Amino acid sequence: NKISDRVSRNDWKDNNQRGGYIWHTTGSGKTMTSFKSAQLIANSKDADKVVFLMDRKELGSQSLTEYQGFADNVDDVQGTDDTNMLISKLKSTDPKNTLIVSSIQKMSRIKEDEIGRMRAKDIEDMQNKRLVFIIDECHRSTFGDMLITIKNTFPNALFFGFTGTPVFSENEKSLSTTTDIFGDELHRYSIADGIRDKNVLGFDPIMVCVYPDMELRKKVAIEEADASSEAEAISDPKMQKIYYRFMTVSEVPMAGRLLEDGTYQKGIEDYIKKDAWENDKYQYSIVDNIKENWLRLSRNNKFHAIFATSSIPEAISYYRKFREKYPELKVTGLFDPTIDNASGDRALEKEDGIVEMLNDYNNWYSTNWDIARYAKFKLEVSERLAHKGQFVRMKAESQLDLLIVVNQMLTGFDSKWVNTLYLDKILEYQNLIQAFSRTNRLFNINEKPFGSIKYYRMPHTMKNNIENAMKLYSGDRPQGLFADHLPDNIEHMNISFKDMEAVFKQANIADMQKLPDDTESKAKFAKLFREF
């Protein structure tokens, strides 16, 4: 194990906190692997304390019991109910307190919570121990400030990160890269490896163009030419030049692109105003598209889906449209329930939306959730969607069909019962891979051959984003990541060809040498040829 080797060779006085990071794709058993690494170090006696840190939400939903199940002995894994208990176990010399599981939030508050009551000697005692921290899901940007605080509190500690989606120079933006924070990559098991080894499923991304490409192109061309109509744009020589430039795909592509000199060339979708993606007509089109394909994609309601939107107001708007048009679908939403009274009408709208969702949910499932207990409501929804806890053997009528979110549940949530992700949201790099990976947990291959993704907003831009993310996170080996429709396509072509042959045979024409004379046969051939 490269982590335990690194710990055994560590000079605890050189203040080098960067132990390295492990890149193991989402769904490959990363959390168990990271936990086992912590256990190996604890057993090796090369460190006084091994602290396994994760997000409090993950710790809350997956529970300490699960981690104790990984261990040989339940007492080998110590939980921490509060900051005081965490401090007590960090100071302890009892061998059973060597391996500690806690949240990164709790660990970051050690100094801030206790500085007034804690003797400097206590902090010094903890700092003098050989501490190893293993951070699960270390790519999360929310961990940034907390990790800095922990590193400052324990300057001699050694830090390791586990992630399915490291941050590289290509996608760092305001984030530091994973290497900057944790050091060198120690081991890699990319999404390409996971799919090829059949540990996770591949993806079937489907682009849905709510607006026809030519409609958008024409709209942008007329606006950029500063014309009031297409006729005016063509008739005026100055306007005409601009109009035809925007109407030419090689001049202005549908999606923007980065040129070799590092400059960004805008695409048609970059010129489209935001309200094109936020109006009722557009939203109803998506709601209808989801419902039209619901039985096919959900395999007759066996599987569930997540629908990620771009904002909370949009999530509420979509929820209401589903309830209005398709009340037979059981739909709910999850997002940050905080009500900011300074936001006025928007805060009221948000509160009304949450109350509506809770009331409908309560009516369906005979529960009594309210905003005050929203965190527990979220836990129940996640268990219902994952068929866990009390919902392991639930009946069909107790299932949830569709969960609408903004950012929640797009990372860290695992359910083999989710097979489809709908996106009215722009995602890139690690956020895209994390969201896609909600759909690719293994199930019976005949019923769930891949994770389905349908994306609507700025579809050509998203298509580029998908290609870029898959290239980066497959280690530049994106082949085999997507559903292979070739066998189905060949079978479909063979059937269409036989049907075309029958049209000519019926008209007594050998080898399709010429078209049949009668209009009906010509029309039938034309239809089959289009399908072919």
Regions found by a protein language model. Name each.
Residues 99-135, 140-149, 405-407:
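Conserved RecA-like ASCE ATPase "motif II neighborhood" in helicase/translocase motors
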Residues 98, 251-405:
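Conserved C-terminal RecA-like helicase domain
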Residues 13-37:
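Walker A/P-loop
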Residues 443-532:
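Long, hydrophobic alpha-helical segments
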Residues 69-115:
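Inter-Walker segment of RecA-like/P-loop motor cores
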Residues 42, 57-83, 321-328:
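Conserved helix-turn-beta segment of the N-terminal RecA-like "Helicase ATP-binding" lobe
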Residues 31-33, 46-69, 309-315:
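Conserved Walker A/P-loop ATP-binding site and its immediately adjacent core
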Residues 172-302, 319-324, 328:
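Interdomain helical connector at the RecA1-RecA2 junction of SF1/SF2 helicase-like NTPases
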